[in-house]
């Protein structure tokens, strides 16, 4: 029989101590892993059974378009180890968060940069509300042209107008020519203007049309995947014209589902798309019947569903009156703002050139009848807390 040396004996003891000291934690890890796998399996099983229920037409709430989301949610089940932010212990990480640079897409409009702190960040839903013919699509086309001029990849989804009509509006904006004159422009001059743009713009703008009230986030995701594969196109910003005439991927449009829940579902799905693809999304909505007749309105005048402004990160109204129309101006009113204080620069006026599909800044002294504007100096993206407040009553 071999004699065990003292060193070997000590090493064996240390090894046994280590095994027994880690046994409890090892068992716990194993238990968590096995439990998580079991929960995942049950979630997938339930999702498949729900999907079969939908395919057989037995679901009164969900359509077949909801199946990918149901399965995706089941596959994403996990035990999250993060149990919250510790105010004291995580102070250093929080300080780093305060000082990290956040990517923002700026406007070419001074007051819009002021109220958003220099532009809108990714993973956000930004809504413009206006009456029929006031300028919802004009705003979206103008900002899409601005983003393209910044060499950002732009995806413009239209559920209202034809692709060529949207491109026509962006042509008018970027080529600085009225829509009427576009139709009489000679081919050589048009080609020269496009080539001039091509020499300065290296990004792409893709316009995709869907039939009204038929396209949902499911279609948009498929489009994004197709563009990435076939054109190697990944958008930096997405425009959807407009939200109320999209479809929900989860809910059926029926008498059993009220407009509040249906429009809220669409808004939540589109905001989820912004988060998933790490882009800001711009869209629009109509005012309701009472708001259409008013020269000023608020969130309560949102058409069909108050769930839309509840979901959006940024919500502004475009207001037109006969007096403003005569001055070629349009009023902007902040209704919701997660980027800044919505009470500072609450109202302001922009110049509008409808023939060229353009918006532009106007001089401060030209802004009239803004009794509750609480305007601040927009210089340097004035975040609402620097500079002297200017609260003027023009009434």
Model-derived regions, located:
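The Walker A/P-loop phosphate-binding site
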Residues: 78-177, 205-207, 376-379, 393-395
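Cytosolic-facing regulatory segments adjacent to core modules
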Residues: 116, 146-234, 347-348, 361
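Structural recognition of the conserved hydrophobic beta-strand(s) that form the central parallel beta-sheet
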Residues: 239, 280-285
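A short beta-strand-to-loop transition that corresponds to the Sensor-1 phosphate-sensing loop
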Residues: 160-161, 283-288, 321
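Interdomain "pre-motor" coupling segment immediately N-terminal to P-loop NTPase/helicase cores
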Residues: 24-87
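Noncatalytic partner-interaction/assembly domains of nucleic-acid and motor enzyme complexes
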Residues: 1-38, 394
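C-terminal regions of RecA-like/P-loop NTPase motor modules
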Residues: 218-235, 254, 272-277, 289-395
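Phosphate-binding/switch loop-helix module in NTP-utilizing enzymes
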Residues: 206-273
């Amino acid at each position: 029989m071999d004699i065990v040396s003292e060193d070997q004996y000590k090493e064996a003891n240390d090894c046994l101590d280590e095994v027994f000291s880690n046994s409890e934690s090892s068992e716990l890890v194993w238990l968590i892993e096995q439990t998580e796998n079991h929960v995942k399996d049950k979630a997938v099983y339930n999702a498949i059974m729900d999907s079969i229920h939908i395919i057989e037409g037995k679901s009164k709430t969900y359509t077949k378009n909801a199946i990918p989301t149901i399965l995706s949610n089941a596959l994403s089940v996990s035990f999250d180890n993060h149990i919250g932010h510790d105010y004291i212990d995580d102070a250093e990480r929080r300080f780093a968060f305060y000082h990290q640079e956040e990517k923002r897409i700026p406007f070419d409009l001074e007051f819009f940069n002021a109220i958003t702190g220099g532009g809108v960040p990714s993973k956000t839903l930004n809504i413009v509300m206006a009456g029929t013919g006031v300028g919802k699509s004009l705003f979206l086309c103008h900002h899409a042209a601005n983003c393209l001029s910044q060499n950002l990849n732009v995806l413009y989804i239209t559920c209202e107008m034809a692709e060529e009509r949207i491109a026509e509006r962006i042509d008018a904006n970027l080529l600085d020519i009225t829509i009427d004159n576009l139709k009489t422009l000679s081919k050589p001059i048009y080609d020269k203007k496009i080539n001039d743009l091509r020499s300065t713009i290296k990004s792409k703008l893709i316009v995709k049309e869907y039939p009204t009230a038929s396209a949902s986030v499911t279609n948009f995701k498929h489009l994004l995947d197709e563009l990435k594969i076939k054109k190697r196109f990944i958008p930096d910003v997405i425009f959807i014209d407009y939200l109320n005439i999209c479809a929900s991927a989860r809910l059926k449009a029926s008498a059993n589902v009220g407009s509040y829940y249906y429009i809220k579902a669409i808004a939540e799905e589109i905001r989820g798309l912004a988060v998933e693809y790490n882009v800001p999304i711009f869209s629009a909505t109509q005012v309701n019947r009472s708001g259409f007749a008013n020269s000023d309105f608020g969130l309560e005048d949102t058409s069909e569903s108050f769930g839309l402004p509840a979901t959006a990160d940024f919500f502004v109204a475009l207001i037109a009156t006969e007096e403003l129309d005569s001055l070629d101006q349009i009023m902007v009113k902040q209704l919701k703002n997660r980027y800044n204080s919505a009470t500072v620069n609450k109202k302001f006026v922009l110049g509008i050139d409808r023939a060229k599909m353009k918006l532009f800044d106007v001089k401060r002294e030209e802004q009239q009848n803004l009794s509750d504007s609480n305007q601040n100096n927009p210089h340097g993206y004035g975040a609402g807390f620097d500079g002297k407040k200017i609260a003027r009553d023009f009434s």
